[in-house]
Amino acid sequence: MWGSLCKAPLLRLRPTFAAVSNVKTIHIKASPDYNEGIDKSKPLKFSTSKASHRHWTVAKSLGSNQQRPWWKVVPLSVFLTTVLLWAIFRKETDIDEAIYKPIEQLQDESENK
């Protein structure tokens, strides 16, 4: 009983191959990207395309709600910059010296204890 009820609507909703192919050709010919006259031996220029950094924004690709407000970005950037500068300019400690010792020397020290 359920099989006969479900088959009829599915058959009516399924588009035919001819209808789908006609829609695809109409869409291809009607789209502004359809270009017969472009010389395909030359490369496309990125600087003039819509993907260029002059045209692209986060709001265009991800939506305007994906942009982070400056008051969230600036403190994180300052913190990471501070940590990086501290790691570069700090003085070496005993721990650093122990880390840079060769493994053989550390094994000899542990055996002598």
Swiss-Prot record:
GO terms for cellular component: mitochondrial inner membrane. One of its GO terms (biological process) is mitochondrial respiratory chain complex III assembly. The keyword Hydrolase does not apply. Belongs to the UQCC4 family. Keywords: Electron transport, Membrane, Mitochondrion, Mitochondrion inner membrane, Respiratory chain, Signal, Transmembrane, Transmembrane helix, Transport. Required for the assembly and stability of the mitochondrial ubiquinol-cytochrome c reductase complex (complex III (CIII) or cytochrome b-c1 complex), a multisubunit transmembrane complex that is part of the mitochondrial electron transport chain (ETC) which drives oxidative phosphorylation. Residues 19-72 are mitochondrial matrix. PANTHER family: PROTEIN CCSMST1 (PTHR35268), UBIQUINOL-CYTOCHROME-C REDUCTASE COMPLEX ASSEMBLY FACTOR 4 (PTHR35268:SF1). This is Ubiquinol-cytochrome-c reductase complex assembly factor 4. It is found in: Mitochondrion inner membrane. The keyword Mitochondrion applies. Residues 90-113 are mitochondrial intermembrane. Residues 1-18 form the signal peptide. Pfam families: CCSMST1 (PF15013). InterPro entries: UQCC4, UQCC4_vert. It is a single-pass type I membrane protein. The chain crosses the membrane at residues 73-89.
